[in-house]
């Protein structure tokens, strides 16, 4: 049997009209993931792919990529939702679709837009460390090298402000609509000596499994299975779980020995990051643990925060955020209301520069450092210790109002 290709999650980011859907459609088409006859005739033929599952068809704004998959020589890619989709941020943060890399799409005729900056900042905040820049719609400027270079310099300066190294990033002139430089080199850009998009995707580095970090398994569900007992189910985020080890669930505070681990209905001796498992722990009953608890080893238990300091970006809030605001924080599988205790600093979201100390309020578009207090026990970790356990989305009124990461915490015990 051929060795399975390594898997990568890929996000497409950038301003809403810059051609992300068309690019993804063309990529899937050229990579053979979609049959030609599925495409409708006419101007937006590629977008069809993206539109199939979108209720936003009427508005002419799509974005539900529905986890489309395609393969390159080296990887199997899953395209995770693009920003613009309402649950994008929540999905990325809660781990359903943490992206390993992103393609930033910027239209050459339009240049860097505010949304371009926001998405770049957000990608960095969400821990996407690898970036490819697709300078799209080159057909609209007659494949002009000078226009490409001018925009390349502008985007390079932008991504540098948030900590990407432009020298490590491929900048590719392409046309999503015409298909230039997606899977094969285009004759329209003889001046371009770099990689095609697919070559750049193949040159991404595979994400390393975080096996050396402390064990963390956020619990998704708890089942009672006849003859086995209580079986918590969850995905191993970090570390390794072995049969016979002692684990503790926090904030529940119960612990016991792991009697069995199963994945895909087969018993396994150990589980690694990315594995979705069910496991049975001696002495832990169904009513002792619940969704949102996190399993770890007894000698390095998950941290329960009495309060924590976070860096957040306010994405969409109809009013202002002040001290005392108590929305729901979605962190791994937990959902806990948390109260804003202090607004420490307001920052420029495109540069991270501090604009104001102790602001009175925050509004849409602001980035900030804040102190918050969970209204009931919550496991969260510092982003620098265990990045997978340090991100969260803030939801209120049925929408994601902000996203952020924990930069410091006061333990509850």
UniProtKB/Swiss-Prot annotation:
GO annotations of cellular component type: cytoplasm
Recorded catalytic activity of this chain's protein: GTP + H2O = GDP + phosphate + H(+)
InterPro entries associated with the record: EFTu-like_2, G_TR_CS, GTP-eEF1A_C, P-loop_NTPase, Small_GTP-bd, T_Tr_GTP-bd_dom, TRAFAC_GTPase_members, Transl_B-barrel_sf
Domain of life: Archaea
Gene Ontology terms for molecular function: GTP binding; GTPase activity; translation elongation factor activity
Residue stretches making up the tr-type G domain: 5-211
Start and end residues of each stretch annotated as G1: 14-21
Region entry G5, spans: 175-177
Annotated compartments: Cytoplasm
Region (G3) residue spans: 81-84
Annotated region described as G2, given as residue ranges: 60-64
Amino-acid positions noted as binding Mg(2+) in the UniProt annotation, renumbered to this chain: 21
Residues reported in the UniProt entry to bind GTP: 14-21, 81-85, 136-139
Pfam families on file: GTP-eEF1A_C, GTP_EFTU, GTP_EFTU_D2
Key words of the record: Cytoplasm, Elongation factor, GTP-binding, Hydrolase, Magnesium, Metal-binding, Nucleotide-binding, Protein biosynthesis
Residue span of region G4: 136-139
Main location, first listed in the record: cytoplasm
EC number per UniProt: 3.6.5.3
Principal EC category: hydrolase
Family: Belongs to the TRAFAC class translation factor GTPase superfamily. Classic translation factor GTPase family. EF-Tu/EF-1A subfamily.
Primary role: GTP hydrolase that promotes the GTP-dependent binding of aminoacyl-tRNA to the A-site of ribosomes during protein biosynthesis.
Name of the protein: Elongation factor 1-alpha
Name of encoding gene: tuf
């Amino acid at each position: 049997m051929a060795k399975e290709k390594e898997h990568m999650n890929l996000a497409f980011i950038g301003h809403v009209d810059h051609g992300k859907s068309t690019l993804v459609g063309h990529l899937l088409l050229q990579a053979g993931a979609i049959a030609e006859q599925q495409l409708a005739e006419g101007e937006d033929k590629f977008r069809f792919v993206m539109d199939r599952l979108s209720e936003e068809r009427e508005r002419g704004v799509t974005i539900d990529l529905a986890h489309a998959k395609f393969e390159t020589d080296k990887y199997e890619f899953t395209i995770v939702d693009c920003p613009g989709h309402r649950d994008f941020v929540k999905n990325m943060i809660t781990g359903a679709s943490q992206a390993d890399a992103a393609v930033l799409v910027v239209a050459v005729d339009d240049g860097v837009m505010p949304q371009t900056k926001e998405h770049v900042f957000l990608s960095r905040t969400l821990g996407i460390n690898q970036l490819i820049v697709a300078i799209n719609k080159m057909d609209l400027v007659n494949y002009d090298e000078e226009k490409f270079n001018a925009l390349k310099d502008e985007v390079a300066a932008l991504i540098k402000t948030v900590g990407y190294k432009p020298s490590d990033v491929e900048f590719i002139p392409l046309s999503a609509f015409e298909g230039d430089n997606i899977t094969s080199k285009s004759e329209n850009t003889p001046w371009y000596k770099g990689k095609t998009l697919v070559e750049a995707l193949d040159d991404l580095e595979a994400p390393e499994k975080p096996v050396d970090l402390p064990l963390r398994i956020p619990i998704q569900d708890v089942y009672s299975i006849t003859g086995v007992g209580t079986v918590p189910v969850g995905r191993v985020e970090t570390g390794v779980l072995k049969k016979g080890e002692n684990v503790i669930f926090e904030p529940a505070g119960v612990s016991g020995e792991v009697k069995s681990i199963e994945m895909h209905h087969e018993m396994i001796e150990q589980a690694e990051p990315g594995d979705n498992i069910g496991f049975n722990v001696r002495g832990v009953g169904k009513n002792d643990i619940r969704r949102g608890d996190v399993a770890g080893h007894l000698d390095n238990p998950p941290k329960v925060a009495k309060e924590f300091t976070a860096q957040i970006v306010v994405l969409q809030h109809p009013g202002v955020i002040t001290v005392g605001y108590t929305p729901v924080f979605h962190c791994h599988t937990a959902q806990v209301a948390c109260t804003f205790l202090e607004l420490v600093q307001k920052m420029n979201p495109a540069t991270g520069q501090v604009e104001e100390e102790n602001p009175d309020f925050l509004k849409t578009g602001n980035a900030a450092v804040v102190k918050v207090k969970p209204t009931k026990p919550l496991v969260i970790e510092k982003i620098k210790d265990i990045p997978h356990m340090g991100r969260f989305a803030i939801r209120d009124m049925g929408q994601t109002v902000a996203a952020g990461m924990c930069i410091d915490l006061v333990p509850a015990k």
